[in-house]
Swiss-Prot record:
Chief location: cytoplasm
Motif (ST]-E-Y-X(3)-Y motif 2): 242-248
Disordered: annotated segments: 49-163
Residues bearing PTM N-acetylmethionine: M1
Taxonomic superkingdom: Eukaryota
Name of the encoding gene: Ccsap
Ranges of compositional bias, category Basic and acidic residues: 108-125
Keywords: Acetylation, Cell cycle, Cell division, Cell projection, Cilium, Cytoplasm, Cytoskeleton, Developmental protein, Microtubule, Mitosis, Phosphoprotein, Repeat
Subunit structure: Associates with microtubules; the association occurs on polyglutamylated tubulin.
Name under which the protein is recorded: Centriole, cilia and spindle-associated protein
GO annotation, biological process: cell division; mitotic spindle microtubule depolymerization; regulation of embryonic development; regulation of mitotic spindle assembly
Function: Plays a role in microtubule (MT) stabilization and this stabilization involves the maintenance of NUMA1 at the spindle poles. Colocalizes with polyglutamylated MTs to promote MT stabilization and regulate bipolar spindle formation in mitosis. Binding of CCSAP to centrosomes and the spindle around centrosomes during mitosis inhibits MT depolymerization, thereby stabilizing the mitotic spindle. May play a role in embryonic development. May be required for proper cilia beating.
InterPro entries: CSAP
Residues modified to Phosphoserine: S65, S191
Protein backbone atom coordinates (compact mmCIF):
# COMPACT_ATOMS: atom_id res chain seq x y z
CA UNK A 1 0.00 0.00 0.00
CA UNK A 2 1.62 3.19 -1.16
CA UNK A 3 1.06 6.42 0.79
CA UNK A 4 -0.64 8.05 -2.19
CA UNK A 5 -3.33 5.37 -2.54
CA UNK A 6 -6.65 5.70 -0.75
CA UNK A 7 -6.27 2.37 1.09
CA UNK A 8 -5.00 2.80 4.65
CA UNK A 9 -3.11 0.20 6.60
CA UNK A 10 -3.44 -0.43 10.32
CA UNK A 11 -0.29 1.61 10.90
CA UNK A 12 -1.70 4.56 8.94
CA UNK A 13 -5.00 4.33 10.84
CA UNK A 14 -3.28 4.37 14.19
CA UNK A 15 -0.61 7.00 13.45
CA UNK A 16 -2.28 9.77 11.49
CA UNK A 17 0.62 12.24 11.74
CA UNK A 18 2.48 13.36 9.72
CA UNK A 19 -0.05 13.83 6.96
CA UNK A 20 0.89 12.56 3.54
CA UNK A 21 -0.67 15.50 1.73
CA UNK A 22 1.64 17.94 3.55
CA UNK A 23 4.90 16.01 3.35
CA UNK A 24 4.51 14.28 -0.04
CA UNK A 25 6.38 16.99 -2.02
CA UNK A 26 9.27 16.95 0.47
CA UNK A 27 9.47 13.16 0.26
CA UNK A 28 9.42 13.19 -3.54
CA UNK A 29 12.08 15.92 -3.65
CA UNK A 30 14.39 13.92 -1.40
CA UNK A 31 13.76 10.84 -3.52
CA UNK A 32 14.69 12.74 -6.67
CA UNK A 33 17.82 14.15 -4.99
CA UNK A 34 18.98 10.68 -3.95
CA UNK A 35 18.39 9.36 -7.46
CA UNK A 36 20.30 12.26 -9.04
CA UNK A 37 23.16 11.88 -6.59
CA UNK A 38 23.41 8.16 -7.31
CA UNK A 39 23.47 8.83 -11.04
CA UNK A 40 26.18 11.47 -10.58
CA UNK A 41 28.35 9.14 -8.52
CA UNK A 42 27.94 6.21 -10.90
CA UNK A 43 28.44 8.18 -14.12
CA UNK A 44 32.13 8.98 -13.50
CA UNK A 45 33.44 6.14 -15.72
CA UNK A 46 30.91 4.85 -18.26
CA UNK A 47 31.76 1.43 -19.72
CA UNK A 48 31.30 1.57 -23.50
CA UNK A 49 30.91 -1.87 -25.07
CA UNK A 50 32.07 -2.43 -28.65
CA UNK A 51 28.97 -4.39 -29.67
CA UNK A 52 26.06 -3.12 -27.56
CA UNK A 53 22.62 -4.16 -28.70
CA UNK A 54 21.47 -5.73 -31.95
CA UNK A 55 21.40 -2.44 -33.90
CA UNK A 56 25.02 -1.48 -33.23
CA UNK A 57 27.20 0.04 -36.00
CA UNK A 58 29.60 -2.94 -35.86
CA UNK A 59 26.80 -5.38 -36.70
CA UNK A 60 25.50 -3.20 -39.51
CA UNK A 61 28.99 -2.81 -40.98
CA UNK A 62 29.77 -6.51 -40.62
CA UNK A 63 26.57 -7.73 -42.33
CA UNK A 64 25.75 -5.60 -45.39
CA UNK A 65 22.49 -6.06 -47.27
CA UNK A 66 22.69 -8.89 -49.85
CA UNK A 67 22.73 -7.65 -53.45
CA UNK A 68 20.61 -9.28 -56.18
CA UNK A 69 22.23 -11.99 -58.29
CA UNK A 70 21.35 -10.30 -61.57
CA UNK A 71 23.49 -7.25 -60.82
CA UNK A 72 26.54 -9.40 -59.98
CA UNK A 73 26.08 -11.88 -62.80
CA UNK A 74 28.98 -10.72 -64.99
CA UNK A 75 31.84 -10.60 -62.43
CA UNK A 76 30.90 -14.02 -61.07
CA UNK A 77 32.84 -15.79 -63.85
CA UNK A 78 36.34 -14.49 -62.96
CA UNK A 79 35.74 -15.23 -59.29
CA UNK A 80 34.87 -18.82 -60.19
CA UNK A 81 38.06 -19.08 -62.24
CA UNK A 82 40.09 -17.75 -59.32
CA UNK A 83 38.58 -20.38 -57.08
CA UNK A 84 39.66 -23.07 -59.53
CA UNK A 85 43.32 -22.00 -59.21
CA UNK A 86 45.27 -23.93 -56.58
CA UNK A 87 46.07 -22.25 -53.29
CA UNK A 88 49.84 -22.66 -53.68
CA UNK A 89 49.97 -20.62 -56.91
CA UNK A 90 48.00 -17.77 -55.31
CA UNK A 91 50.36 -17.68 -52.31
CA UNK A 92 53.40 -17.54 -54.60
CA UNK A 93 51.90 -14.68 -56.62
CA UNK A 94 51.11 -12.70 -53.47
CA UNK A 95 54.64 -13.16 -52.13
CA UNK A 96 56.19 -12.00 -55.41
CA UNK A 97 53.99 -8.90 -55.42
CA UNK A 98 54.95 -8.06 -51.82
CA UNK A 99 58.66 -8.48 -52.53
CA UNK A 100 58.42 -6.19 -55.55
CA UNK A 101 56.67 -3.55 -53.44
CA UNK A 102 59.15 -3.73 -50.58
CA UNK A 103 62.36 -3.76 -52.69
CA UNK A 104 63.02 -0.23 -53.96
CA UNK A 105 65.85 0.76 -56.34
CA UNK A 106 68.64 2.30 -54.26
CA UNK A 107 70.38 5.38 -55.75
CA UNK A 108 73.96 4.79 -56.95
CA UNK A 109 76.56 5.87 -54.41
CA UNK A 110 79.05 7.14 -56.96
CA UNK A 111 76.65 9.69 -58.39
CA UNK A 112 75.73 11.00 -54.94
CA UNK A 113 79.39 11.29 -53.91
CA UNK A 114 80.58 12.87 -57.16
CA UNK A 115 77.87 15.52 -57.49
CA UNK A 116 77.35 17.21 -54.09
CA UNK A 117 78.22 20.60 -55.52
CA UNK A 118 75.64 20.29 -58.30
CA UNK A 119 72.88 19.61 -55.75
CA UNK A 120 73.90 22.67 -53.75
CA UNK A 121 73.86 24.91 -56.82
CA UNK A 122 70.43 23.60 -57.82
CA UNK A 123 69.05 24.30 -54.35
CA UNK A 124 70.43 27.86 -54.36
CA UNK A 125 69.08 28.51 -57.86
CA UNK A 126 65.62 27.14 -57.12
CA UNK A 127 65.20 28.97 -53.79
CA UNK A 128 63.92 32.36 -55.10
CA UNK A 129 61.80 30.95 -57.94
CA UNK A 130 60.31 27.71 -56.51
CA UNK A 131 57.22 27.91 -54.29
CA UNK A 132 58.53 25.13 -51.99
CA UNK A 133 60.79 27.21 -49.68
CA UNK A 134 58.10 29.89 -49.30
CA UNK A 135 55.72 27.31 -47.87
CA UNK A 136 58.27 26.00 -45.35
CA UNK A 137 57.81 28.78 -42.72
CA UNK A 138 54.05 28.33 -42.86
CA UNK A 139 54.47 24.59 -42.35
CA UNK A 140 56.77 25.26 -39.38
CA UNK A 141 54.20 27.64 -37.90
CA UNK A 142 51.50 25.04 -38.36
CA UNK A 143 53.63 22.43 -36.58
CA UNK A 144 54.32 24.87 -33.74
CA UNK A 145 50.61 25.60 -33.39
CA UNK A 146 49.84 21.85 -33.33
CA UNK A 147 52.39 21.35 -30.55
CA UNK A 148 50.94 24.29 -28.64
CA UNK A 149 47.44 22.86 -28.96
CA UNK A 150 48.53 19.38 -27.89
CA UNK A 151 50.27 20.49 -24.69
CA UNK A 152 47.11 21.72 -22.85
CA UNK A 153 45.35 18.46 -23.72
CA UNK A 154 48.10 16.49 -21.99
CA UNK A 155 47.93 18.74 -18.93
CA UNK A 156 44.14 18.34 -18.73
CA UNK A 157 44.50 14.56 -18.98
CA UNK A 158 46.98 14.62 -16.07
CA UNK A 159 44.57 16.73 -14.00
CA UNK A 160 41.74 14.30 -14.75
CA UNK A 161 43.89 11.36 -13.63
CA UNK A 162 44.62 13.06 -10.29
CA UNK A 163 40.98 13.91 -9.63
CA UNK A 164 38.80 11.73 -7.43
CA UNK A 165 36.48 9.49 -9.48
CA UNK A 166 33.38 10.35 -7.43
CA UNK A 167 31.74 13.76 -7.10
CA UNK A 168 32.31 14.41 -3.40
CA UNK A 169 29.57 16.61 -1.96
CA UNK A 170 30.72 19.49 0.23
CA UNK A 171 34.37 19.29 -0.81
CA UNK A 172 36.17 21.75 -3.05
CA UNK A 173 38.89 20.94 -5.52
CA UNK A 174 41.51 22.86 -3.54
CA UNK A 175 40.94 20.73 -0.46
CA UNK A 176 41.21 17.58 -2.58
CA UNK A 177 44.50 18.79 -4.05
CA UNK A 178 45.83 19.58 -0.57
CA UNK A 179 44.90 16.08 0.57
CA UNK A 180 46.77 14.45 -2.33
CA UNK A 181 50.01 16.39 -1.78
CA UNK A 182 53.05 14.60 -0.37
CA UNK A 183 54.40 15.31 3.10
CA UNK A 184 58.01 16.26 3.72
CA UNK A 185 59.79 13.89 6.10
CA UNK A 186 62.70 15.39 8.02
CA UNK A 187 65.91 13.41 8.47
CA UNK A 188 68.22 14.06 11.40
CA UNK A 189 71.20 14.44 9.04
CA UNK A 190 69.48 16.94 6.70
CA UNK A 191 70.52 20.57 6.93
CA UNK A 192 68.06 23.38 7.66
CA UNK A 193 68.28 24.76 4.11
CA UNK A 194 67.32 21.42 2.51
CA UNK A 195 64.13 21.01 4.58
CA UNK A 196 60.76 22.44 3.61
CA UNK A 197 59.66 25.37 5.80
CA UNK A 198 56.42 23.73 6.95
CA UNK A 199 58.28 20.50 7.79
CA UNK A 200 60.85 22.47 9.77
CA UNK A 201 58.11 24.19 11.77
CA UNK A 202 56.46 20.83 12.46
CA UNK A 203 59.79 19.39 13.60
CA UNK A 204 60.40 22.25 16.04
CA UNK A 205 56.82 21.98 17.31
CA UNK A 206 57.23 18.26 18.02
CA UNK A 207 60.51 18.83 19.84
CA UNK A 208 58.88 21.47 22.08
CA UNK A 209 55.98 19.10 22.82
CA UNK A 210 58.41 16.31 23.75
CA UNK A 211 60.25 18.61 26.17
CA UNK A 212 56.97 19.67 27.80
CA UNK A 213 55.86 16.05 28.25
CA UNK A 214 59.23 15.08 29.76
CA UNK A 215 59.04 18.00 32.23
CA UNK A 216 55.47 17.07 33.24
CA UNK A 217 56.46 13.43 33.86
CA UNK A 218 59.43 14.49 35.95
CA UNK A 219 57.23 16.78 38.03
CA UNK A 220 54.61 14.07 38.59
CA UNK A 221 57.31 11.59 39.63
CA UNK A 222 58.84 14.04 42.13
CA UNK A 223 55.38 14.81 43.59
CA UNK A 224 54.67 11.10 44.05
CA UNK A 225 58.00 10.57 45.80
CA UNK A 226 57.36 13.52 48.16
CA UNK A 227 53.86 12.27 49.02
CA UNK A 228 55.16 8.79 49.77
CA UNK A 229 57.73 10.27 52.10
CA UNK A 230 55.18 12.48 53.91
CA UNK A 231 52.43 9.89 54.30
CA UNK A 232 52.57 8.11 57.64
CA UNK A 233 52.23 4.33 57.70
CA UNK A 234 48.55 3.48 58.03
CA UNK A 235 47.55 1.40 60.98
CA UNK A 236 46.37 -2.11 60.17
CA UNK A 237 43.56 -1.77 62.71
CA UNK A 238 41.55 0.66 60.53
CA UNK A 239 38.64 -1.42 59.11
CA UNK A 240 37.77 1.20 56.45
CA UNK A 241 41.19 1.19 54.82
CA UNK A 242 41.11 -1.11 51.81
CA UNK A 243 44.01 -2.66 49.96
CA UNK A 244 43.52 -0.23 47.04
CA UNK A 245 43.68 2.79 49.43
CA UNK A 246 46.73 1.35 51.14
CA UNK A 247 48.62 0.83 47.87
CA UNK A 248 47.48 3.88 45.87
CA UNK A 249 46.74 6.48 48.53
CA UNK A 250 49.69 8.65 47.39
CA UNK A 251 47.92 9.55 44.12
CA UNK A 252 44.56 10.31 45.76
Amino acid sequence: MSPGSGVKSEYMKRYREPRWDEYAPCYRELLRYRLGRRLLEQAHAPWLWDAWGPDSPSDSSASPSPAPRGALGEPSAPSAREEEQPVGERGAELRDAEEQDTVLPAPPKKDTEEKPEEHKTKETDGAPSGPGPRQQPSALCARGSKKATRSPQRSTSKIKENKHPFALYGWGERQMDMGSQKTHNVCASASVHEIHESALRAKNRRQVEKRKLAAQRQRAHSVDVEKNQRVKPASAENPWLTEYMRCYSARA
